[in-house]
Amino acid sequence: DNIYNKDIQIVLFFFKQKSYVYFCKNFTMDFFSTSKTLGILGGGQLGKMLLYTTRKWDIKTSVLDPNENAPAKLACDNFTVGDLTDFQAVYDFGKKVDVLTIEIEKVNVKALEKLELEGVKVYPQPHVLKTIQNKCLQKKFFKSHNIPTASFEEFETLDQVKEAIIKGELSFPFVWKSAEMGYDGYGVTIVQSNKEIESLDIGPCLIEELVTFEKELSV
């Protein structure tokens, strides 16, 4: 809500695609201060980088992470050890902050839904996070919004994948992706032969065509 002190007038001038901010009347060094607390689920490297900015803006932060020595621990105002997938841990943590965000998508969405209903501002919103957490839902989202993506097929079990190969419905090579719990390359495998299939997780997944590309971008 108000990230600037009320007694500071801000005048923005746009000239040649540059923004000039002029602070008038009672200029102070804490003009970025806020009385609200930002909660961050996850205290890894990304959380630590986020805290670089919150400290510059004098934003009070609380971090929840299962690792008592998480990278973000030293840079936040309050640190709590807790399971990000545990409903009660996430809910109790969220009740102590004004705005809640994530550093990693592996968090308890049901707790976030309850917090949002009770007035806590959650970003990204829980319904968006549900899509982010599941690669099958992601692909369906791309397809329904006409966003170009590699062709794919969903499978509930690894046995179904094997059966599709036997029937000639799938051919090597292809990309196997775990529907959930995949991150930083984990849960993604380029499969070249039947032998490599045996090392894959047996749960829900999607099989994606192997495409050539020049550059990979993460947004």
Predicted regions and their residues:
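ATP-binding N-terminal substructure of ATP-dependent carboxylate-amine bond-forming enzymes
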Residues: 25-128, 132-133, 137
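Polybasic, lysine-rich low-complexity intrinsically disordered segments
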Residues: 10, 18-19, 26
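Intrinsic-disorder-associated, low-complexity terminal segments enriched in Asp/Asn/His/Tyr and depleted
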Residues: 1-7, 26
